[in-house]
């Protein structure tokens, strides 16, 4: 029999590079392709289309097998049951907030352990909105997204291939192409986590970003995306200047304000968690960080 360890608290996600400067490892052939990709990644509807296009069950099946895949899926960056306010989990609080962000979030189940985000029809609808706006900006299609992967890891390569397959199937390869760049372990690290600065980050989307909590408060997850958290914004979003123009364009100063409001509530835990749920809802709607799975645990044991 196969058993599975308990899901861990860390979260694995896709980072979105909103201000890419480095193209050493890239399938892009022209400046027009680079510009088109950057404009697309700055468009929230486009990012949401990617979020809804990913079959997380297929993705995690590469590691856990089909039967154990769902156990590892995470739909919010903060685990849905990380804290509670009264009889409501953190995920319940976020669900209440999401209704204010648009019909695309209607009916989405944000609980851990099931794929609540995968919805090809929603993906197509969000992409259609994005394409209309982007064509008005002179964007060329298909949008090419560079996804780096460590070629020495068969599991990582398989997961990258799964992302490519499901995103292109959901959105159409005439619209979006995932270009998998298989790199040596050293090149992979230097292009992502160990990049000297944001300008050295060499990717459009990266599924190699993981974060775990240091204490039992939602801020331990959410504060890493404050515009002043330069080391983390470098790794997750491709910028490290709090005054970065792309960060301002996608509204991250609004996110800062939500976090500041939550942090200021120090006497009423329920109210504090409710405010952090508002920040998590903003982050989820933005699709600047796309949750995939737990970063540890939920592993098969024979």
Where are these regions (language model features)?
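Short, well-ordered beta-strand elements
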Residues: 12, 141-152, 178-180, 204
